[in-house]
Amino acid sequence: MNKSNLKGRIIYTGSTELNTYVYSGELLTSSDKTNLSHPIQLNNLYHYDSSNQLVITEGLEDVSAHFALFFKNQDLIKVPAKTVAVLNKYMTKDKLYDIHPDKDVAIELCLLFLSNLTDTFFKMRDTQDVYEKAGWKRLKAQILNEQLTGSKFESDTRKNIIAALAAGTSKGIIAECDGIYSKGHHSFSYRLGPAYLSKGVESYEVKTKYVKQLLNKAYFKAISETIDNPICKNLIKVYGSIELPTKEEVLAEGRRLVKEKKKTKKGKLISSLNKHKKEYFKDADKRSFIEESIEIFEYLTDNGFMVPRVGNAKSGGRISDSFTLMPSWIRNLVKMDGKKMIEADYSALHPNIAMSLYGGSKEFITHAEISKESGIDIDSVKIEHLSFFNKTEKDMYKSNLVNYYSKNELTMLRNLLEEKRTSEFEHKITSMRMFKKEVDIMTEVIKDLNKVGIYVIYVYDALMCTESDKEEVTKMMNNVIINHGVKTIAK
């Protein structure tokens, strides 16, 4: 295969939020015999459908040359710190043999399950959700079955793994289940035991053939979901042109932001731990520490880029990848073909989407306008708008924005609240509809940009592009959004 276009370029894509990996580096065509035996982990939950192998040989003319998916080590997964050692040294043989007749396979299956909980280390540090703050995470039984056995059907393997981890070792329980299940609403939740909760992350290289095959099956599922989505196809094509900052560059930028007392989009003061523990800072919850941001960056990129993941209906189909999950101040250091990237985004997109969906009277609302009319400082308006419409009715009435909307957009507010009260999805229906509208808009924008040869990094309601493409990108964004009935402008 022709690899001349790769010469002289150092490109690596990395491990991600949920250890999702992409394989890359060779051009794939229907006639290639490329070895695809290494794995991709999809959202820490491994999916498999044997028919997915056909996807590799069909319909890839426009994306095959861009499955640029480089690994440093193709068999790495991310697991909670200390779990590898404790499973090997202290888990009793009888519990392992209940899982699989091969002890080494049983241990790796336990690690595979635990890899689903790895990202709680990061989520616990940066969430206001009480459930996530305590380390809990919902995992669907059907997907766990597929991850751990290659089949969606119920099996004793999953149950025996959970039982073994809950029983634990002489060092304590390794993971626990909350035992709360509601059909059609939420699955069982799991979290790490006290000895492993918030203790960090480590890399583990899978060694057994059986577990490698499970990982391999996830590879085909990941690709099949990626190539069917316009945003994902765009991302696959752009990854090969991306240059990540070095750790030294990230650290230097972080120190600059600390010195200048900059804040994140959520209003947190960018700070440095400076070798202190977080407990040293009385207002730690109001700070974003550069050391933790660098940990996330390395987690997302130290072994390749994440396979873009299409969210479910509850997320409106939003796409997650290494860049949507990356701290924004680090993402701003990324380059495309050696060129600095800048962001193009819509002005007050979600308030204007709410106007469109729920019968609002105003058009082209801005944060500045709301700040002026409400007397709330503009930074607080921006931060509160990140979550205002998605809250429960009770929490919306606690917001400092509710008075503005009650006074200026009462019909819109009543329509929105009525839907929350009557929908089977309750208050979550609002975010579902608004995210769906956002995704529809961004999908059309990206498709139109790709037609003229422009590829971008997707960040939910914003796009990152080179400075030379900015004018065309904002023009396309403005053309598309008007056709969707949302009155705002891109800048």
Placement of each model-derived feature along the sequence:
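Acidic, glycine-rich two-metal-ion catalytic cores of nucleic acid-processing enzymes
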Residues: 181-376, 460-462
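Polymerase palm active-site segment centered on the conserved acidic dipeptide of motif C
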Residues: 469-491
